[in-house]
Amino acid sequence: MPRIGLLIVTAVLATVVAGCSKESDQSSEKSPDWQRGRAVFLANCVACHNNDPTKDGSIGPAIAGSSKELIESRVLSTSYPANYKPKRPTKVMPQFPFLKEEVPYLAAYLAK
């Protein structure tokens, strides 16, 4: 009987460990552009936006699914594209001109 219990416990633990590592496996399967965009996002955006771009941050809104056009407008000039209705029409976001080359990578990361 003890062997069966040990086998069951081992199987349960293996299942839990496999489930925990699923997210890291998925991110390693992402493109280099996605991974670079994630690094840029974590280094420059999470002070205001949530670590999880699908959720609102302390200051900034959720930004997952944002278009490249919107990201470029907001990051480089803090404006909005024509005919875009903002989630929060604030003037709080600063410009990040040094991220000009990173916009395509941010767009890859934030795409749905």
Where are these regions (language model features)?
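Sec-dependent bacterial lipoprotein signal peptides
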Residues: 1-18
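ATP/adenylate-binding site constellation spanning eukaryotic-like Ser/Thr protein kinases
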Residues: 10, 42, 68
